[in-house]
């Protein structure tokens, strides 16, 4: 049975103490529900930090759902305490402009809490608007940034600022970049590159989630920003 935790939080307690534990932020949306599914399928213990627990439709003995806001630092810290890694799929509004950068504020609290409780592994996301030192100059590394500048300038700024904040800290981070998540069937086949490999922008949300979860037990892309597509 899933243990529900109220907004004040408690430290994660699972039936088994020998399993890897991860905290997932943004666990009630499109990609996020698949992150929960694949993490639980791998036998991980999962603490899902959400604003609205009724949106979490999965029930599992190794899933704890904790309710909180992104500005609630103490509750975020409690969710991360005892975990081995963090996955964030916190979104940003894909609008021309908007008022507050809630995802950035939440990331600052997540990073601060990780450092305070001694958790170093972070898997996060961005778009190819965020440039990486190993990127080749190609359509997929250039055009998304131009499009975002025209259509979603504030979202682009927030995503880049989040990526900069993650890289500035002494964390074992991986930032998974993608362009066009779709509600298409899971394939299990993901193309990975840095602009030199031809791929389609569109990719199934579940494929994104599975790739992010896979990074928990892999060191291949630590301090790296792979671009994934289909």
What are these regions (language model features)?
Residues 23, 47, 174:
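Conserved beta-strand positions in the Rossmann-like core of class I SAM-dependent methyltransferases
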Residues 103-105, 158, 176, 203-213, ...:
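Substrate-positioning beta->alpha
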Residues 163-184:
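Conserved beta-loop-beta element that borders a ligand/cofactor-binding pocket
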Residues 136, 185-190, 215-224:
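Glycine/proline-rich active-site loop of Rossmann-fold NAD(P)-dependent oxidoreductases
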Residues 23, 54-109, 113-116, 216-217:
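NAD(P)H-binding glycine-rich loop region in Rossmannoid oxidoreductase-like domains
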Residues 45-47, 53, 97, 105-154, ...:
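Conserved Rossmann-fold NAD(P)-dependent oxidoreductase catalytic core, especially the SDR/UDP-sugar
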Residues 49-55, 178-180:
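Short, polar loop motifs at secondary-structure junctions
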Residues 22-42:
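N-terminal Rossmann NAD(P)H-binding glycine-rich loop of SDR-like oxidoreductase domains
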């Amino acid at each position: 049975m899933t243990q529900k935790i109220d907004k004040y939080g408690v430290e994660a307690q699972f039936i088994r103490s020998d399993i890897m534990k991860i905290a997932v932020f943004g666990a009630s949306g499109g990609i996020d529900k698949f992150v929960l599914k694949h993490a639980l399928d791998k036998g991980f213990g999962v603490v899902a930090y959400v604003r609205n627990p009724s949106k979490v439709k999965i029930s599992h003995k190794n899933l704890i759902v904790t309710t909180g806001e992104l500005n609630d630092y103490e509750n975020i810290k409690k969710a991360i305490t005892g975990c081995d890694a963090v996955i964030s799929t916190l979104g940003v509004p894909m609008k021309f402009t908007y008022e507050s950068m809630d995802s950035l504020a939440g990331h600052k609290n997540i990073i601060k809490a990780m450092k305070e409780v001694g958790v170093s592994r972070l898997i996060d996301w961005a778009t190819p608007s965020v440039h990486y030192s190993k990127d080749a100059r190609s359509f997929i590394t250039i055009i998304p940034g131009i499009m975002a500048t025209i259509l979603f300038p504030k979202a682009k700024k927030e995503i880049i600022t989040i990526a900069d904040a993650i890289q500035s800290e002494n964390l074992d981070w991986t930032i998974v970049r993608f362009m066009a998540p779709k509600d298409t069937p899971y394939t299990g086949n993901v193309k990975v590159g840095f602009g030199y490999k031809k791929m389609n922008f569109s990719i199934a949300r579940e494929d994104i989630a599975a790739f992010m979860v896979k990074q928990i037990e892999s060191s291949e892309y630590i301090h790296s920003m792979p671009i994934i597509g289909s």
